[in-house]
């Protein structure tokens, strides 16, 4: 699959073994192929996992209340903290590509390989950031389709308003504070 091959090339360029560290969508596809199903985690995560499999594009769901300030994809300094799902604290290696916030928390390691237990979706989560990334040739048209699919499903299932955007080198920011303000307004109404 072109979508997976592009991530494997990207991981190789980062110095990672692409069959040891797989992007999230490849890991989901492998698990689904081997087991015939995926574990049920949370309705929103299950929905995003199904869409990730359908598009072969990694999708992550972050609990916005666990993110300090903005989140950015960048190289680690090595001082960031990453909370595993088992509760252990790790420190990403310097130059590793991570999702980091203003407090030095790493919310994902090895770019799209592993999400942090800190910002994982839980039953008490009220506001989320859903991120989809792709590197393959038709990513510029496939990612907006994936985002539209998620937005349509969220509106149909939960009747919620979704703010969405596509980031690029010419438009590298998505204002999380506006997304949080929208969520707060919805809770107050």
Q: Model-derived features: where do they sit?
A:
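RNA/tRNA-interacting regions in translation and RNA-turnover enzymes
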Residues: 1-189
């Amino acid at each position: 699959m072109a979508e997976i091959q592009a991530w494997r090339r990207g991981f190789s360029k980062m110095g990672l073994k692409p069959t040891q560290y797989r992007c999230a969508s490849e890991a989901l596809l492998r698990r689904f192929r081997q087991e015939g199903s995926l574990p049920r985690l949370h309705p929103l995560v299950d929905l995003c996992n199904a869409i990730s499999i359908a598009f072969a594009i990694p999708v992550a769901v972050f609990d916005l209340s666990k993110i300090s300030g903005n989140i950015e994809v960048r190289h680690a300094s090595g001082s960031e903290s990453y909370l595993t799902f088992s509760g252990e604290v790790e420190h990403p290696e310097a130059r590793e590509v991570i999702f980091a916030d203003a407090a030095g928390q790493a919310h994902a390691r090895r770019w799209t390989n592993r999400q942090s237990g800190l910002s994982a979706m839980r039953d008490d989560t009220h506001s989320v950031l859903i991120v989809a990334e792709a590197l393959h040739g038709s990513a510029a048209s496939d990612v907006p389709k994936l985002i539209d699919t998620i937005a349509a499903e969220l509106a149909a299932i939960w009747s919620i308003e979704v703010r969405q955007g596509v980031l690029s080198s010419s438009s590298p920011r998505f204002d999380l504070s506006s997304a949080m303000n929208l969520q707060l307004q919805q809770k107050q109404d």
